Amino acid sequence: MTEKVKRVVLAYSGGLDTSVILKWLQEHYGCEVVTFTADLGQGEELEPARKKAEMMGIKPEHIFMDDLREEFVRDFVFPMMRANALYEGQYLLGTSIARPLIAKRQIEIARQVGADAVAHGATGKGNDQIRFELGYYALAPDIKVIAPWREWDLNSRSKLIAYAESRQIAVPKDKRGESPFSVDSNLLHTSSEGKILEDPWQEVPDYVYSRTVNPEDAPNTPEIITIDFERGDAIAINGEALSPAELLTKLNELGRKHGIGRLDLVENRYIGMKSRGMYETPGGTILIQAHRGIEQLTLDGGAMHLKDELMPRYAELIYNGFWYSPEREMLQAAIDHSQARVSGTVRLKLYKGSVNVIGRKSPNSLYSEKVVTFEDDAGAYNQQDAAGFIKLNALRLRLLGERNAKGL
């Protein structure tokens, strides 16, 4: 028997899945539905989502549409960039990092309207169900969570489309007149999954890409830019101070123009299976390269190496949905502490899909040209000191070698 629910807050995009879920919640639970649509910079008009919700019987006062772009970049993307976070060495976590913010705002709305449940449109095969629900429970331990994909019998795209058509819910088509790929988009990235991409041997067709030009078609002339950093966060491009969301938007424009940030990836989902996705992260790809460039100049070597050791664990926590966990917060505190003097300017070259650091400077630089020079260093470094350093580090290896020579 279905548990009684009076009012539910649905994370609503206005797309096919969440529109079907909205109708299903009304029919299956007989409850009042409140919709929440987050503007995370996905680049789509949000008003169609409002109109669609109204057409499906949602009261205007129960339709929430929030511009979260600045909060998204400032409080979620930038902290992650301070860590140089990459899941499995490649993925910039564009979908993963958006879910904690959506969950946070959903819970806030649920409290505001007196809802006793929240709902999402993530499937029972993916990571997003975990990310959303770990966020819900961390912020509202007693909230009821409705995950329709784990409850209903609409277990395929064809059944979902049939349900939609039977209830006059518009079924979107892509530019080829076909049902679209599974797409997630925000200010940091766009991901595409499903259909032909489910065969990992098939090359991603060019028509799938939406955020970047083909690198082969990018300008034949490189573009040189500078990014200014303060305490680990980017604050300006080419000397122009920008807000976090404005800065990432500008980097996205530059990355799009030069075909930067495409990634074809087979990844290990937390749920246990492998999946293949196509990611476009133009601005984020530029930003992480620039951040590493300024760290190379300003971060102590031991601190940098420790940070690099911690990064995979930090990235895994975000990927798996543990943004609100104490261990993520502990790692974040250490990472943020490391950024106290990570300030300065990085110069980069953008060209046909590549981004390369070609210069960096900082008032906090640990780089000493006087010490490292191949020319006369005027006594800044005594090369004879290296002999004792090497002997001490070789001691255990010499003892091991002596034992091996005895055949022991």
Swiss-Prot record:
Q: Which reaction does it catalyse?
A: L-citrulline + L-aspartate + ATP = 2-(N(omega)-L-arginino)succinate + AMP + diphosphate + H(+)
Q: Which Gene3D superfamilies has this protein been placed in?
A: Argininosuccinate synthetase, chain A, domain 2, HUPs, Single helix bin
One Pfam family this chain carries? Arginosuc_syn_C
Q: Where does L-citrulline bind?
A: 91, 96, 127, 131, 182, 191, 267, 279
**What keywords sit in the KW lines?**
Amino-acid biosynthesis, Arginine biosynthesis, ATP-binding, Cytoplasm, Ligase, Nucleotide-binding
Q: Where in the cell is it found?
A: Cytoplasm
Q: Which InterPro entries match?
A: Arginosuc_syn_C (IPR048268), Arginosuc_syn_N (IPR048267), Arginosuc_synth (IPR001518), Arginosuc_synth_CS (IPR018223), Arginosuc_synth_type_1_subfam (IPR023434), AS_cat/multimer_dom_body (IPR024074), Rossmann-like_a/b/a_fold (IPR014729)
PROSITE patterns with a match to the protein in the record: ARGININOSUCCIN_SYN_1, ARGININOSUCCIN_SYN_2
Q: What is this protein called?
A: Argininosuccinate synthase
Naturally occurring in which organism (per UniProt): Zymomonas mobilis subsp. mobilis (strain ATCC 31821 / ZM4 / CP4)
